[in-house]
Amino acid sequence: MTEKLSTETRGPLLEPLFASGWEMVEGRDAIKKTFVFDNFVDAFGWMTRVAIWAEKWNHHPEWDNVYKTVNVVLTTHDVGGLSTLDAKLARKMDSLAG
């Protein structure tokens, strides 16, 4: 079972994500990032590719899409905060966004 990030694992997993634009969500043990694409088709295509990985890993983002902008929040509800799954999905999102 996935566990909430410990103090020891939090820094090494999250610092590279912060360097790529991810931020902590105020008042929650969650991270967020806004992705902006050239147009709606690119944004929705990216969301579709992410959804395939999210389903494969059974870990789903909180997200919304307006035209070419996608706002993402990641947390693991089962553990009440951030887990390795969030870091893994964030890295995948970054790589798929190019």
Swiss-Prot record:
Gene Ontology molecular function: any one: 4-alpha-hydroxytetrahydrobiopterin dehydratase activity
Enzyme class: lyase
GO biological process: tetrahydrobiopterin biosynthetic process
Reaction(s) this enzyme catalyzes, per UniProt: (4aS,6R)-4a-hydroxy-L-erythro-5,6,7,8-tetrahydrobiopterin = (6R)-L-erythro-6,7-dihydrobiopterin + H2O
Pfam families: Pterin_4a
Transmembrane region(s): none
The protein's Enzyme Commission number: 4.2.1.96
Keyword Zinc-finger listed: no
Entry similarity comment: Belongs to the pterin-4-alpha-carbinolamine dehydratase family.
Protein name: Putative pterin-4-alpha-carbinolamine dehydratase
